[in-house]
Each structure stands twice: as structure tokens, then as C-alpha cells.
A protein has these predicted regions:
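Phosphate- and other anionic-substrate recognition elements at nucleic-acid/protein interfaces
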Residues: 1-223
């Protein structure tokens, strides 16, 4: 059975496609669903991916808050980047487009989506429901599960990880990253290319959440 697990985000949508046999990973990555324009400044051949707040009046070259201040653009006439007329519609269209590109997602049996609080962050809740609606309407998922974020930390059964972080949110992020790092290396059936992907990622917290949530659901199936 194939389990497709999503960690919900407004800019980064992490996913993990797992096989219940041997708990192997078929696909694991981050989808950039941001609709906000990004900074065009290039440093050492790499384009800045931060959200642009200003743009040059002459060429429309976009800059983030940090790069607006550097000497190279100091004498440029800048204006604010125009706001999207309907950001939620643009975000919804972007999510559908990105999901359509992932043909292997249609091979899943169950979709797991991290449940979002409706009042605390309504945009995140909307993203959750767009993903839910997408898989509901294509009719191929046998089940779509909303998973409480607290459950992902329940899957680790190894030695206790020492952590002196008191703030709950940061503590949970730290532990999720540690748990995931240990678990993917202990499972010898997982392709080592995913070890490298995880090690190289700047979004280990999102990748961890998607993986651990999928494992939580699989464990529930076996209870």
C-alpha cells in the first residue's frame, strides 16, 4: 500500500510517499508553492529566493528587503512590488498545477494531511482543504486522513534524545528532525539517496514532519 503524507505550508509543501512494505520511501521532497515574487539578486551564481518587496522603476528588477540596502542598488529608484489581487486564488491554482506535475502521486492509496487549526492560521487551513479537495475530486485515493500534528512525535521508539529547549514549538521541531534522522538510517530498506536529500536540505523540519506523519499512519494500520 502507498501512503502519501503532506506537511502543510504556505510556501513549502513537504511530502513523503511511503510504501507500507518495509516502510520504504518512494519519493520525498519539498514543493515550492509560493506565489509571491522572489528577489532577482544573484550572488555566486545563485539567485536569492526571498520574497521581493521592492522593484526598480526602470527595469522591474525585484529585490528583497535585505538586498534593497546593498551598495549595488543604492542609487536605483525603487517602488513597491504590486500585491496580488486575489492571493488565495493564485495560491490554489499554484497548488493544483504543482500536484498535477507529480504523476507518481496518482499511485497512492491513502493521503495523509497535517490538520491545521482553523482560527489560528486560516490560510494554512485553506491550503489543507485545497489539497484535500484535489485528491477527493480525482477519485483515486481510497482514504484521506487529517492527522493531528502532535502524533508525529509518537513514532520514535529509540533511546531518549536529550533536549533542553523549553519552548514547545522549537522543541518539537528539534525532536522531529532528530527522530527522522535516526529512523531513516536505521531502516536499511530506504535508498541512501534519501539520506543525502535529507542531509542537504535546508527544510529538514518540513521533510521530517511529512515522513513521521506517514509512519504514524502506517503504525496505526498495524495496531
Amino acid at each position: 500500500m502507498k501512503i502519501l503524507s503532506f506537511d502543510v505550508g504556505i510556501k513549502n509543501l513537504a511530502y513523503c510517499l511511503l510504501d507500507t512494505e518495509d516502510l520504504t520511501i518512494d519519493d520525498w521532497n519539498i514543493i515550492n508553492i509560493s506565489v509571491d515574487p522572489t528577489c532577482d539578486h544573484v550572488n555566486k551564481g545563485k539567485c536569492c529566493d526571498k520574497t521581493a518587496t521592492k522593484m526598480t522603476k526602470d527595469s522591474g528588477f525585484k529585490l528583497c528587503t535585505s538586498h534593497c540596502k546593498i551598495k549595488l542598488y543604492k542609487d536605483k529608484k525603487l517602488r513597491n512590488v504590486p500585491k496580488l489581487d486575489n492571493r488565495m486564488l493564485s495560491l490554489g491554482n499554484q497548488i493544483v498545477k504543482k500536484l498535477d506535475e507529480k504523476k507518481n502521486f496518482m499511485n497512492m492509496d491513502v493521503v495523509c494531511i497535517e490538520n491545521q487549526p482553523a482560527l489560528k492560521n486560516p490560510t494554512m487551513k485553506s491550503v489543507q482543504m485545497i489539497i484535500y479537495s484535489y485528491f477527493l475530486m480525482n477519485g483515486k485515493a481510497k482514504d484521506i486522513q487529517m492527522i493531528n500534528a502532535r502524533n508525529k512525535l509518537k513514532v520514535y521508539t529509540g533511546p531518549k534524545i536529550e533536549c533542553d529547549i523549553k519552548e514547545t514549538y522549537k522543541r518539537n521541531k528539534f525532536l522531529a528532525i532528530k527522530y527522522c534522522d535516526i529512523m531513516i538510517r536505521e531502516n536499511t530498506h530506504i535508498d541512501k539517496k534519501f539520506h543525502k536529500l535529507y542531509d542537504d536540505s535546508k527544510k529538514k523540519d518540513d521533510l521530517s514532519d511529512a515522513y513521521l506523519q506517514g509512519i504514524y499512519y502506517i503504525n496505526k494500520l498495524n495496531d
